[in-house]
Regions:
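Mixed-charge, Lys/Arg-enriched low-complexity segments
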Residues: 1-9, 57-89
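Short glycine-rich, low-complexity/disordered patches
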Residues: 25-38, 79-89
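Acidic, low-complexity, intrinsically disordered interaction modules
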Residues: 27-33, 39-67
């Protein structure tokens, strides 16, 4: 499992509210992702994760890792956006 709990990105393009171990942030079981003015919500469904924006389902994933590796924003997997933020590329 890729541990994102240590990250809390906040810049002009991307805002992450990162999961805790029990998938709960301030009592909410959702993770909000804002990217270039678009808002996304990552919602856990058991071990699975569903991504939706403005009421439209954008993807269903088997795990958070599956989501990071396979969900694409602007043609890039989500993990690439995370790496860009982490390493400043």
């Amino acid at each position: 499992m890729i541990d994102l709990t240590k990250y809390n990105f906040d810049d002009d393009d991307i805002t992450f509210l990162i999961q805790t171990e029990d998938w709960c942030i301030n009592g909410q079981s959702e993770i909000i992702l804002e990217y270039k003015g678009k808002s996304f919500v990552l919602e856990p469904r058991g071990k699975a994760v569903q991504v939706y924006a403005y009421g439209e389902v954008l993807g269903d994933y088997e795990s958070f890792d599956d989501l990071l590796l396979n969900h694409k924003i602007d043609g890039k997997p989500l993990i690439e956006l995370v790496k860009e933020l982490e390493y400043g590329n």
